[in-house]
Amino acid sequence: MTPALAAGLQVVFVLAVLAVAYVPVGDYMARVYESRRHLRVESVLYRLCRIDPHAEQTWYGYAGSVLGFSAASVLFLYALQRIQGVLPLSGDLSGVSPAVAFNTAVSFVTNTNWQSYAPETTMSNLTQPVGLAVQNFVSAAVGMAVAVALIRGFVRVSRGGEIGNFWVDLTRGSLRILLPFSFVIALILLSQGVIQSFHPGFASTGLDGNSVTNALAPVASQEAIKELGTNGGGILAANSAHPFENPTPVSNIVEILAILLIPVSLTRTFGTMVGERKQGLTLLAVMGILWGSLLAVTLAAESGRRGVAATAAGAMMEGKEVRFGIPGTALFAVSTTGTSTGAVNSAHDSLSPLGGGAVLLNMLLGEIAPGGVGTGLYGILVLALIAVFVGGLLVGRTPEYLGKKLRQREITLAALSVLVMPALVLIGTGITVILSSTTGYQGNSGDPGSPGSIHGFSEVLYAFASASNNNGSAFGGLTVTSDWFQTALGLCMLFGRFLPIIFVLALAGSLASQKKTAAGTGTLPTAGPMFTGLLTGTVVLVAALTFFPALALGPIAEALQ
């Protein structure tokens, strides 16, 4: 079988499974969030927490609940890491240092899962499931809740601007969607050889004759939600390149499907809830065009034979697992950076300049191809409003989307939401590269314009793009254990997560308080090929105008050498 045929078959299989799951999963999630019935276990939780599940919240009440819950989660996870040495199942591990504990707590609560530590030698078998795995569920559920709140903003007509109840949305997303889906995925991964154990580990002798300690952990259960919730943080440092996490080509495809399942299906949920399923298909088409284009670029770049080693191997195999090959590696890399997952089955730092630039651009587009769980949907909806506004200017009409007028307030909130990530990425990268104290942490450096300095800049740009987009993947040549990186990247994760959430919820409240207007002859149609092209162009144009200078100094310059 030729590499091209292998790549084509894997892509076709992934798309076929997603197509089969699209309608049932999307409609199921719509029923979950629209249902008036509460499961018995949900009712018990509401009573224990003194929550009125029938009480509606305005946007600021909803935002306050999101921020309060997330702040409590950060404090709990930070404390758990600091005292893990005196807790059961800690083995020989001590408490985590303050800087790493802060960075990790912020990372997992924001759905970033940036890991500046070796998990198997830092986190205990209690901290992993009780602290980190729990956040894998609830941080994903928070993103889905915000997306659903924005959908309600388009659907509802309420003078008070109520957009739902955060606590109900959080509970339903966790118990009715993420938990059962994760259980099924975990069983499939177990069948492929992914480990599930609370044993501290075992010793073995390597080929060089030295003794090696192999860490064991409850991997399968966390691996499932790691991918399904677009979290990405692995129990093992090698992440999904490790055979304990991702042992076979079949498990690799299962993990890719888990990454894409909910973000793709949420477009169907959106179309179902607003009563116009073509609207969801239009958003899905934009996501598919961007995802497919970057996948083609990455496959072509990594299948090339640049250099003696690549020519001998038949492709750019450095940093890649032979059991996955170029197709499985490229498919995973584009899927994990097009969502907020950040899991890796290869060393992204070893990707070719063009391939590394493609996965970096995937994040800089705003992670909307197809985006993280919930975050991808509300991210592309915000960009859709920008596209409608631009289209309205072209035809001289008041912009409308789904019967709601886009006034100055709505456009301002949409623009602010879009601008948060670029500001964090460019400011963080700029400050880092001019600080002399950070150069020692760059594995690649040198005189200005040299290959080392160019790739070193790409590593810094990638780190801040990953943190600000709540992705979590990294170019491994950059050492991020210093207090500067722990703090700066931690702040980027916080602001990159919660500022857009605040703006999106404010937008949802503003839309919900409006009356619906009937579409007229001058209304821009927002379903179909024309709007698909307009929205795709808007996404690319915003990213190009914002990041082209930075990309020209990094991946583009490196590719041209």
Curated annotation (Swiss-Prot):
Coiled-coil ranges from the UniProt annotation: none
Main location: membrane
Membrane-spanning intervals of the chain: 5-25, 60-80, 86-106, 131-151, 177-197, 247-267, 281-301, 324-344, 376-396, 415-435, 488-508, 537-557
GO CC term (a single one): plasma membrane
GO molecular function, one term: P-type potassium transmembrane transporter activity
Keyword ATP-binding: no
Pfam families (UniProt xref): KdpA
Keyword entries, A-Z: Cell membrane, Ion transport, Membrane, Potassium, Potassium transport, Transmembrane, Transmembrane helix, Transport
Subcellular localization, as worded in the UniProt entry: Cell membrane
Membrane topology type: Multi-pass membrane protein
Domain of life (superkingdom): Bacteria
Family affiliation: Belongs to the KdpA family.
Function: Part of the high-affinity ATP-driven potassium transport (or Kdp) system, which catalyzes the hydrolysis of ATP coupled with the electrogenic transport of potassium into the cytoplasm. This subunit binds the extracellular potassium ions and delivers the ions to the membrane domain of KdpB through an intramembrane tunnel.
HAMAP family: KdpA (MF_00275)
Subunit structure: The system is composed of three essential subunits: KdpA, KdpB and KdpC.
Protein name, UniProt field: Potassium-transporting ATPase potassium-binding subunit
Organism: Rhodococcus opacus (strain B4)
Lineage: Bacteria, Bacillati, Actinomycetota, Actinomycetes, Mycobacteriales
GN (gene name): kdpA
